[in-house]
Amino acid sequence: GMVMQDFALIEEYTVQENLLVPLIFGKVKKREQSKKIMDVLEKVNIAELKDKRVNQLSGGQKQRVAIARALINSPEYILADEPTGALDSNTSDDIMDVFEELNKNGHTVIIVTHDNGVAARCQRVIEIKDGEVLSE
């Protein structure tokens, strides 16, 4: 799953419709789709927004929809580009808790960040500048 820094959501779709797209491509059975959507929305604390259009959401809410979309098919690998950039500190902590739980359950989570607080919560940090590895 991929979390884009600019969210890459379909603005005219509802939250639920945005999450349905990867389920359809992932060939998830129709009867399982609603449950998967609600489960992932609850995980990122935005279940109440499922019927809202994305263009009506705040930046932090869009960020959580983008994270939910990346997680919806339970991918083995998750690449998250600045996944907490649009979030307040409490929500950022909650999302990092989700990533840590996924990691404990065998998922590989790669986070690209400029936030030292986020980096401090990672198991392994690689510092890169101008394409060169500065430290590991």
Roles of regions detected by a PLM:
Residues 5-10, 24, 115:
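Catalytic "switch" loops of ABC-type ATPases
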Residues 13-20:
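Short coil-to-helix segment of the ABC ATPase nucleotide-binding domain corresponding to the Q-loop/switch region
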Residues 32-44:
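ABC nucleotide-binding domain "signature" region
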Residues 52, 73, 105:
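Conserved signature/switch motifs of ABC ATPase nucleotide-binding domains
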Residues 53-57, 61:
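Conserved ABC ATPase signature
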Residues 67:
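Hydrophobic anchor residue at the start of the ABC signature
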Residues 78-81:
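Catalytic Walker B motif of ABC-type/P-loop ATPase nucleotide-binding domains
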